[in-house]
């Protein structure tokens, strides 16, 4: 009773912890996942309605930020200013907003409330034609200023920093000096004495291209560990698929319905990991993401998680093992799976597109409540199914469900530990200094999902004794008939049976005479007309057995 009560209260505790939409790793990819890599190449039209361009990333040491300018000649004078700042805390990068660039630059100039170091430089161009030419910056540009009282470590470097591309020159303004989170800001000041010329040309000046290249091409320090992780997970799911196909091919005659569901989850997981890995490779070599691939990956992830939840629900209900059909419960299962697919797909698509962050957060809330309700339903169904198996004394199926329940409980316990760890390490700290481990916040949930999937594969693997887990009507009816006597024995266990004495009166003789009369009636008087007519029509023992079977069905 205590264990059952704990299982019912557990989903509520997980929801109150709050950081994740799914208490079970098998159901979830974790918190608001950032599985896809961020782009490292931008094309910004100037003017774009604002004079500032900025981004925040975790970069490798010696990562170079390139600028390229293309467009039509113009008579406007342009003042290009760069700022590159490192930070000791990832919070500074995460909380940075493009709308607050001017306020951030004021803090940077006053050296207050910020950590790390920064480089800055400014160059004036008399017209656009000069801007489009290959530029060479002197050592004054690489001047590095310490923040928060740090010692002056930067030295002026008189080496020219010029990069010549294949077609158009790329200006090389800045290079990172350590592995750290960085904020890069470009300010474009437009000034001209000819107001009319300025007004005419503002609508079509030029395009600025920003590229970030490091030791792994366009892949940043934040995304490189995730690319390796998805490559490994893609290999793992391929091995899962090969193993499951081999098992299924050996025992294809005795496959259960649930084993087809497990195969579908493996296939969708393989596709999901392959699409994510392909997206990381595209970012690495091209610097830009394919939005269609991102949406496809998120939809595949939503379908996989929805199918996984549906699989666990029908297993916990005992479908195909304890019950031949779900009946009315089937509609509830379908509605639950469809709702989860809707909310998870909507949340994932809105998150990767980045168009409606507030709407994505709103979609996350019902997803968390739905996931918690499903978890509650699963554990309640498991307890009821295990009680039924105990009553029927089906040791094989009961052992299977015990292992399955223990696996889910371990998954919940691991999820609680990871929720507490990620909350204390990444969310409630004032300075996220462990930014190298940020990728774990996303990877750990996918890894835990795969581990639980592997346990389920082992528990429900196809084998020669596959049918011992299947529902069989005859055996279930026999078990229901046989369970009554053991239950009576357990109920009266410890009680003594009083011996009965034969009464001296003549009741026993009367009872014996009645039994003899009943025996003669059963032997000589037919119970129905069919007992008299059918024997004359039967020609063989086989026909008698068929007739007996048909009569039993009619009764």
UniProtKB/Swiss-Prot annotation:
Keywords: Cell membrane, Cell projection, Disulfide bond, Glycoprotein, Golgi apparatus, Membrane, Phosphoprotein, Signal, Transmembrane, Transmembrane helix. Residues 22-225, 279-305, 347-361, 425-437 are lumenal. It comes from the Eukaryota. Residues 247-257, 323-325, 383-403, 459-555 are cytoplasmic. The keyword Glycoprotein applies. The chain crosses the membrane at residues 226-246, 258-278, 306-322, 326-346, 362-382, 404-424, 438-458. Residues 502-511 have a biased composition (Polar residues). Glycans are attached at residues 79, 127, 157, 160. Changing residue 271 to F: Reduced mechanosensitive channel activity in Tmem87a-expressing cells. The modification Phosphoserine is found at residue 540. One of its GO terms (biological process) is detection of mechanical stimulus involved in sensory perception of touch. GO terms for cellular component: cytosol; Golgi apparatus; Golgi cisterna membrane; Golgi membrane; plasma membrane; ruffle. Disulfide bonds join 74-128, 89-431. Residues 1-21 form the signal peptide. Residues 484-496 have a biased composition (Basic and acidic residues). Residues 473-516 are annotated as: Disordered. May interact with STOML3; STOML3 potentiates the mechanosensitive ion channel activity associated with TMEM87A. Potential monoatomic ion channel gated by mechanical force, implicated in normal touch sensitivity through the generation of mechanically activated currents. However, a direct channel activity is debated and an alternative could be that it functions as a chaperone for an unidentified mechanosensitive ion channel. Could also be involved in cell mechanosensitivity regulating cell adhesion and migration. May also be involved in retrograde transport from endosomes to the trans-Golgi network (TGN). Belongs to the LU7TM family. TMEM87 subfamily. Named Elkin, from the Greek word Elko, meaning 'to pull'. This is Transmembrane protein 87A. It comes from Homo sapiens (Human).
């Amino acid at each position: 009773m205590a264990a059952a009560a704990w299982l019912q209260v557990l989903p509520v505790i997980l929801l109150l912890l709050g950081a994740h939409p799914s208490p079970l790793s098998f159901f979830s990819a974790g918190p608001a996942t950032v599985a896809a890599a961020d782009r490292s190449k931008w094309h910004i039209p100037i003017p774009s309605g604002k004079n500032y361009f900025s981004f925040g990333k975790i970069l490798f040491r010696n990562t170079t930020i390139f600028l390229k300018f293309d467009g039509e000649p113009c008579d406007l004078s342009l003042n290009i200013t760069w700022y590159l700042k490192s930070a000791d805390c990832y919070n500074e990068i995460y909380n940075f907003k493009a709308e607050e660039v001017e306020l951030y630059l004021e803090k940077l100039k006053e050296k207050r409330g910020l950590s790390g170091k920064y480089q800055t430089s400014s160059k004036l161009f008399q017209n656009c034609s000069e801007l489009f030419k290959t530029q060479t910056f002197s050592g004054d540009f690489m001047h590095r200023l310490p923040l928060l009282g740090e010692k002056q470590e930067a030295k002026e470097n008189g080496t020219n920093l010029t990069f010549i591309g294949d077609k158009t020159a790329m200006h090389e303004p800045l290079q990172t000096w350590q592995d750290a989170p960085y904020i890069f800001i470009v300010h474009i000041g437009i000034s001209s004495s000819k107001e009319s010329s300025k007004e005419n040309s503002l609508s079509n000046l030029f395009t600025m291209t920003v590229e970030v290249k490091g030791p792994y091409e366009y892949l940043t320090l934040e995304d490189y560990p995730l690319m390796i992780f998805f490559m490994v997970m893609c290999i793992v799911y391929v091995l899962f698929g090969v193993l499951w196909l081999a098992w299924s091919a050996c025992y294809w005659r005795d496959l259960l319905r649930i084993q087809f569901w497990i195969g579908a989850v493996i296939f969708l997981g393989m596709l999901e990991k392959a699409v994510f890995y392909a997206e990381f490779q595209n970012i690495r070599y091209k610097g830009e993401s394919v939005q269609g691939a991102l949406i496809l990956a998120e939809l595949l992830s939503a379908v996989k998680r929805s199918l996984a939840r549906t699989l666990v629900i029908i297993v916990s209900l005992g479908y195909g093992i304890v019950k031949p059909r779900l009946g009315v419960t089937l509609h509830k299962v379908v509605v639950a799976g469809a709702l989860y697919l809707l909310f998870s797909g909507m949340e994932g698509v809105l998150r990767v597109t980045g168009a409606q962050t507030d709407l994505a957060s709103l979609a996350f809330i019902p997803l968390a409540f739905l996931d918690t309700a499903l978890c509650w339903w699963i554990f309640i169904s498991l307890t009821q199914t295990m009680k039924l198996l105990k009553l029927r004394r089906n040791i094989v199926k009961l052992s299977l469900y015990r292992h399955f329940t223990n696996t889910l409980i371990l998954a919940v316990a691991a999820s609680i530990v990871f929720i507490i760890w990620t909350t204390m390490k990444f969310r409630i700290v004032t300075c996220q200094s462990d930014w190298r481990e940020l990728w774990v916040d996303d990877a750990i949930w996918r890894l835990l999902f795969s581990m639980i999937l592997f346990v389920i594969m082992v528990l429900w693997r196809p084998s020669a004794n596959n049918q011992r887990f299947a529902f069989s009507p005859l055996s279930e009816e026999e078990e229901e008939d046989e369970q009554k006597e053991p239950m009576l024995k357990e109920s009266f266990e410890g009680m003594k049976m009083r011996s009965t004495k034969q009464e001296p009166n003549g009741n026993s003789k009367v009872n014996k005479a009645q039994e003899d009369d009943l025996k003669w009636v059963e032997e000589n008087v037919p119970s129905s007309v069919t007992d008299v007519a059918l024997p004359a029509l039967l020609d063989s023992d086989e026909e008698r057995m068929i007739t007996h079977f048909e009569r039993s069905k009619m009764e």
